[in-house]
């Protein structure tokens, strides 16, 4: 597949089940020598170089697999790509662990011959091989806890494709040399309880259809929540400065502060030696005489009268 070719997913699901807004396909990324050397530096670089996430948006839902989809895909390519960019930004801020909301089993893949880039139907029929995009059929199956636990033990096999820790079963499609379909393996039982959701990606990377690692439904619940900010808000609510019980509003009593000062002075006096105490008493006894000389008083009675 050439770079920039449109890719389409056709997902078979039960009619009463809710379709996903978008699907995220993790594909193995081809590595060059420069990418490999950069990936060895950090674990994040190794993970980024090993897998590439591709977002497929929901276009429409059809009632049967025989309904043409070229018109739906062509109409979806006309609007701006702002919604797809928004999903990509949200995806970068998503958590790594995803809820088990079901699994997707690969049924078949239709590869285009690469002779035309147009989405116009050929001869009035749905020419999948010459429609200018690649089509991959998936089946959405309800999660079976017992089967999921059994398949989780198969993760050691590097050739196993996992979706939410569940093995994907790829049913290959035989294609002739001219690009026409030869054998399309399909369930012979037709069930009216199923519908088909059409997803598309305008700029799919080369080789994505052969290197699928996992298929996950996109959800807004993947957005990160900063728990630290929430805890800080709780602490701010509890620490009200205007509250009477706040420790900042506790002031000591004036009487107790005076008693504390007196006790501190008494402790300091008791800590002095006998010689230091006699010197201090002598200084206090000479204090009135010094004041009398300074202010030219003739007798201590004049000092008391002031």
Curated annotation (Swiss-Prot):
Q: Where is the composition biased (Basic and acidic residues)?
A: 31-43
Q: Where is this region: Disordered?
A: 30-49, 231-278
Q: Look up keyword Protein transport and say if it applies.
A: yes
Q: Which cellular components does GO assign to this protein? A: cytoplasm; nucleus
Q: Which Pfam families match?
A: Iwr1
Q: Which UniProt keywords apply?
A: Cytoplasm, Nucleus, Phosphoprotein, Protein transport, Transport
Task: State the compartments where it is located.
Answer: Cytoplasm; Nucleus
Q: Which InterPro entries match?
A: SLC7A6OS (IPR040218), TF_Iwr1_dom (IPR013883)
Mark out the compositionally biased spans (Acidic residues): 231-243
Gene Ontology biological-process annotations = hematopoietic progenitor cell differentiation; protein transport
Q: Which residues carry this modification: Phosphoserine?
A: 299, 305
Role summary: Directs RNA polymerase II nuclear import.
**PANTHER family, A to Z:** RNA POLYMERASE II NUCLEAR LOCALIZATION PROTEIN SLC7A6OS-RELATED
Provide the family line: Belongs to the IWR1/SLC7A6OS family.
Q: What is this protein called?
A: Probable RNA polymerase II nuclear localization protein SLC7A6OS
Which gene is this protein's source? Answer: Slc7a6os
